[in-house]
Amino acid sequence: MGSPESEVSPDVQEQEAATDNPEVFEEDSADAAEGEDQIEQEEPPNCDEEAYNRDAAAATMQVGEDLGEEGDHVQEDPAEESCQIIPFESDSVEEDFSPTLTENPYEIFPTESTSFCNNTYSLDESANGHEPVCEICVEEVPGVGPPLNQHDSLPDGSGEDSPVVPDVVVVPENEGPVDDALSSPYVMGVGLLSLGEGAQSDTQAASGTLSGYSTWEEGDSEGGQVPVDRKNIATRARPHSGKVAGHVPETVLEETGPETCSSGMGIRDTSDEVRKIGILPEGKPPECVRALPAKPRAFTLYPRSFSVEGRESPLSMFREPEGAGLDSHRVRRKEDNLSLPGAIGSSGSFSQRSHLPSSGTSTPSSVVDIPPPFDLACITKKPITKSSPSLLIDGDTLEKASKKKKSSFKRFLELTFRKKTESKVHVDMNLSSSRSSSESSYHGPARVLELDRRSLSNSPQLKCRTGKLRASDSPAALIFYRDSKRKGVPFSRTVSRVESFEDRSRPPFLPLPLTKPRSISFPNADTSDYENIPAMNSDYENIQIPPRRPVRTGTFTKLFEEQSRALSTANENDGYVDMSSFNAFESKQQSSEQEAESAYTEPYKVCPISAAPREDLTSDEEQGSSEEEDSASRDPSLSHKGEGQSRALVIAQELLSSEKAYVQMLQHLSLDFHGAVLRALENVEQEGREPLAQEELRQGLRELPAICDLHQGILESLEQRLGDCGEGQPQVADIFLAREQEFEHHAAHILQFDRYLGLLAESCLLSPRLATTVREFEQSSQGGGQSMKHRMLRVVQRLFQYQVLLTDYLNNLCPDSAEYDNTQSALTLISKVTDRANESMEQGENLQKLVHIEYSVRGQGDLLQPGREFLKEGTLMRVRGKSRHPRHLFLMNDTLLYTHPQKDGKYRLKSSLPVANMKVSRPVMDKVPYALKIETPESCLTLSASSCAERDEWHYCLSRALPEDYKTQALAAFHHSVEIRERLGISLGERLPTLVPVTHAMMCMNCGCDFSLTVRRHHCHACGKIVCRNCSRNKYPLKCLKNRMAKVCDGCFRELKLRNGPVPGSMRERPVSMSFPLSSSRFSSGSALSSVFQSISPSTFKKQKKVPSALSEVAASGEGSAISGYLSRCKSGKRRWKKLWLVIKGKVLYTYLASEDKVAMESIPLLGFTIAPEKEEGSSEVGPVFHLYHKKTLFYSFKAEDSNSAQRWMEAMEDASVL
């Protein structure tokens, strides 16, 4: 149903318009007649280019004349042209497109600036009297720009008093015939209209449109005027690198300083004078079309890059003011600069400065605001792809969504751009393009661009279609039209719209960070679909992000009425963006480790919930290789915060539970053990043996009942406090402060702890009854099977446990609370006692370190054991294929804790490796620097250190922890000694060997022959050596392979046959050189040749390599060498470095091609040689290069990995060069 205004007769409307502006009506009548002639003279789109070139050349010659006539003509005709903004709605799709064009002589001019129109609107409905309601996000800023000339004001003086309707400045086209042969698909078409067509419907539609627009402007601007700095906008032409015919240089808008005046805003030359444009004065009826002032104005329109996140990108439209005489700054728009006909876009190619207030105004897409909390999880799902244009989805109401078709994607209006050489519309849109400058080329004739909604990658396709355009429900909707010759009379409209469905999955009000700025141009029409990226895809390009401005959210409520849009995660085509470089969010951003870090390492930290779990950021190899790490994130101890319990309350409960166990242990010591020892000491006194020592021991044991009473009181207070607080803040620190004097019993016990233990051991030796008493207590259920020394250490251990628990508790308290200060005082009290323990006890520091490790490693039981000492800890990288994962190692003298770091700063135990059965080596691996291999009977670990010094330090500590009798056994076992294997109880073939890498052997490890193209490498599956084909012709069933036949070397074959017997007949191996089976008639018992072939051994055909004995004495991987490793060597006078394996043993330098070679290439006795380092110029430090001289003659130059390695090699060579 149309509104009452739409029912007014056309004659009445025309009379009103003429009455209000009689000059306009008369001029429009004449212009309409000219427009009809011009439409008839338009050429079809497929005509050649020569006509267009002639028109363009003629227009160029008239530039000076047009500019000279411009000012006078505008004064004579101040209201000759208007540009209106109206809705357009059409239910027709492709089949309705031709009739519409027939009725409407204007060409459809879809631009990217109209890509966010929410719906379509048909001409038929307007003609039938339906009045649409359109909300247009167009904001105008009066009062900014150059001062008005005397001809720049409206006749009625309302030029400065109409902030409701903006000025859309459009330069009219020439009245002559227009060549459409080369009409660009990206030029906004401008057609002409006769008076007879669509007159009535146009007036009605205009009234509805303008009234709707006026309502939107008033509501959005909140009665204020929005300033836009048009003075600081200039243009520049940016040609791309491709210097080809038809090349498309790009002209982008830039912001300049205040010194740039508006006269430099010209972009294209035309052959027509500048026209005035009419607007609606404030307070006048919307049906009365007024003339617009000629004052240069800018408009903020919402382009296609407006995203669902709630941030808009303004499309600034402005006109060149009269008197702009900088002809040299103008760019003639011809074939070579059709990158954006009439609409020049740029995505961050110039710095944007926002002058808009915070009253709900628009924000450019290149000035994206990211609301807190800073969360990039939703934009890090997939990398940027060239074929992923980001489009807009406009929110529809539930009623409108129910009327749509089954397809979840919105329909698109075809994109038909008509080129008008006289059009002088200047559009500044914040756009982006992912196309590189090398892809710039002429895009050919008019082209229709549409997005294939079935394409998963959202690559644009070429297709023509029309869509339904209706009044918009959101500020993202924009309907733009122009009337080139008419002002007060009815007019026809051409409307274009581009919709988007890609942003459906984005959460609301979360704008996307963009990548680096690039300029806009369009790819060739002949390229593939993924090159046809729309110009207005500014959702995945990086730009500089300014500080956030508040934006009203009430305007965008209808965009997110569908719950699926509001709750969805991220756009699948958005790329990851590192936001660490943006200064605006330095105080808000956090690393993933800091977000999940426990308050044990950072006090009073609130961790926000991350939208992307950490498991999503790990590689597939990491997830597959460490299932414990995935399960660790679901540890119940880590989920207390999610259950509503604070971390401080969890620590207090842990303190209570451990206190109960400690008090129970103290009761056994003070009652059972203390009483039994006192009775035994009385019997010793009766015997008269050293009463002084027994009295001292009795005094030391008297502290146990006092310590038990102290902790019994602490336990009762903790139970009462935690029972009363419930889920609130616990108060436990004052419990320790109230018993400050009683902790002196702990101090006295610690001071004489070592003395008491020594006296107890001596008394047990002197008194068998006391020794029996101690032994019975250790074996009883109260003793738990632990030694007396271990039980006594438990008493002191509790103080160190208090220290780590109170530290963690303190870090989870609010610094402003009273409990925070009390906890600091309690921690100071406990630290005084533990400091005494470190000073007086022999194992004080070691005990403290073991307590810290036990508290930090989850899954580890009691680390406190008699005789256990802490040696080293550190982080190494676990090597698994191409993946590298951090692993934290804790080395004690009897065990190695292999853990991986957790998010809260603690560690998850993966395995505990006994040091006694460990084999440690430093293998040389191609892609693993500073490798360290740890082998045990159960597992094999390959680790990588950060430096050679760190690797060597770990190797030294691990080797020192090995038992002396096991070191040589493990080292010999690594080098495949059968005798050592027997001593270690490792039978050949029962366990899979460690295969030698193929790059570590350049010759057979059995016979010493060199490997070549014909002599290939083969692994022995019994010992792991690399041997040649002649040395591996035998196979034997191995237990480690479930008795399957496997290739073994000759030495292992002999050993296996000697131990397990010959190969069973059913599994007997035929000669490799024979291609027919043993059951063949050729091998029958009656054949004379069978015995001959069977007697021939392949070893008889071996070519034994003649090797000097001096080169075969030492193997490359042999033990007992002073130093070994890879060095780069070059001969004197040459510059070519060659990487070789060098070994110094017995004052001889052996050179090998690889680390597992059996025979050396050469050997050099180092006696008499001198070593000199090569120092860098201007530096006294020794570099990685050093030289080997013999009698002042340069013999060799060597280059190590670093200076430390070079220093060790030089020291070893100097030692070997001296007798």
UniProtKB/Swiss-Prot annotation:
Signal peptide annotation: none
Disordered, as annotated region: 1-85, 94-113, 201-227, 310-367, 586-644
Tissue specificity field: Expressed in highly vascularized tissues, such as lung, kidney and ovary.
Gene3D superfamilies: Dbl homology (DH) domain, Pleckstrin-homology domain (PH domain)/Phosphotyrosine-binding domain (PTB), Zinc/RING finger domain, C3HC4 (zinc finger)
GO cellular component annotations of the record: cytoskeleton; early endosome; endoplasmic reticulum; Golgi apparatus; ruffle membrane
Presence of the UniProt keyword Zinc-finger in the record: yes
DH domain ranges (all copies): 647-840
Main location: cytoplasm
Zn-finger region bounds: FYVE-type: 998-1057
Segments forming domain PH: 869-963, 1120-1218
GO molecular function: guanyl-nucleotide exchange factor activity; zinc ion binding
Acidic residues bias (residue ranges): 23-50, 618-630
InterPro entries: DBL_dom_sf, DH_dom, FYVE_RhoGEF_PH, PH-like_dom_sf, PH_domain, Znf_FYVE, Znf_FYVE-rel, Znf_RING/FYVE/PHD
Binding site for Zn(2+) 1: C1004, C1007, C1028, C1031
Keywords per UniProt: Cell membrane, Cell projection, Cytoplasm, Cytoskeleton, Endoplasmic reticulum, Endosome, Golgi apparatus, Guanine-nucleotide releasing factor, Membrane, Metal-binding, Phosphoprotein, Repeat, Zinc, Zinc-finger
Entry binding sites for Zn(2+) 2: C1020, C1023, C1049, C1052
Task of the protein: Activates CDC42, a member of the Ras-like family of Rho- and Rac proteins, by exchanging bound GDP for free GTP. Mediates VEGF-induced CDC42 activation. May regulate proangiogenic action of VEGF in vascular endothelial cells, including network formation, directional movement and proliferation. May play a role in regulating the actin cytoskeleton and cell shape.
Name of this protein: FYVE, RhoGEF and PH domain-containing protein 5
Organism for this UniProt entry: Mus musculus (Mouse)
Origin organism lineage: Eukaryota, Metazoa, Chordata, Craniata, Vertebrata
